[in-house]
Amino acid sequence: MKPIVAGVAGTVLLAGAIFVGTIVSDKISVDSNVGEQEATVQTQLPTTAAAQSVVYAPPSIEEVPDGPMKEAILYGYELVNNTHVAADEYVGNQLSCTSCHAGAGYDEQTSSLVGVMANYPQYIGRSGSIVTIEERINGCMVRSMNGKKFEMNSDELEAMVAYFAYISEGVPIGAKREWAGTSDMKNVPIPNVADGEELYAQSCIACHAADGSGTDANTGPALWGENSFNDGAGMARMSKMAGYIQNNMPIGTAGTLTDQEASDLAAFILSQDRPEWANHDKDWPKGGRPNDIMDKEKREQIKNGTIDWEKVLSTN
């Protein structure tokens, strides 16, 4: 049975929203060169010793204090760590949030979600609007999870937000999360797909399987095929995939791949068939659509040898 968290979570989140709104309304600037060309709203906080000394120190999921929020936080953790099972009616593949955000977002080195509440609301160029943390979660649900959105008042969504709020304790709104960084590769070299295929066979199949179908959602997720992310997900971009591979793979020896090797691997993985995003035409409504989104057209160009890699990588 799903826990009933809406009333409790809503009360706490409302208080948080009032706090966030007070700060955000003070001063907001938009940087159009952030991340995957998804301009980010950055809240400008006073320069204080506390704001400058934010460290990675999330509270333990093993020590969630007793109280009205405990059930919601623990349910949120389960949803993040085991998404395709805990929220199976919403997920269209065999991935979990942990597939990319290791340790349910706790891992300091792998796309950490610790302190994520400090970065929302945020302007996302892909949607052409300012989005809340709830909207960002739902964006992942329909793209990375190839599924459907949670209802805005659902137990699932409110539990996930409660969990993110918990692991964001001590991180002020607008603070720079040094541990989060960005997985983008800024200058992706022209890839060699054949070399990427060879490298995949040598180094990746033990966890991700020869056919890319994966062996476990959290330790060896599907990289292509029907159980992977669709081509509207951020990871379907060359700059994102190559950067993620170089920063995090192979497990145990992350950071050892060259730019060229990471690019080769990314190109091979993204050349494979995967679910198609139905709303490419609605993305980037205000312009700035990057060229390195590896959609069906580009996958076919790779297969028939007509892809113009210089053009694809020209925005990175």
Q: Where are the model-predicted features located?
A:
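Short helix/strand-bridging catalytic loops that position acidic/His residues to coordinate divalent metals
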Residues: G181-V188, G220-G232
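Sequence/structural segment immediately N-terminal to covalent heme-attachment motifs in c-type
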Residues: P68-A104, V188-G220, W224, M238-S239
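Post-cleavage N-terminal segment of exported redox proteins
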Residues: M1-Y77, T83, Q122-V193, I302-N316
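Extracytoplasmic electron-transfer domains, predominantly the class I c-type cytochrome c fold
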Residues: K70-Y75, L79, D107-F150, M160, ...
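Secretory-pathway/luminal and periplasmic proteins that interact with or process carbohydrate-rich
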Residues: A86-D88, A104-T110, I167-P172, Q272-N279
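Short sequence/structural segments immediately N-terminal
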Residues: V30-Q37, Y90-L95, Y106-D107
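A cross-kingdom marker for long, charged
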Residues: E276-N316
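Surface-exposed patches in mature extracellular/periplasmic domains of secreted proteins
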Residues: V85-G92, K148-N153, G174-R177, T253-D259, ...
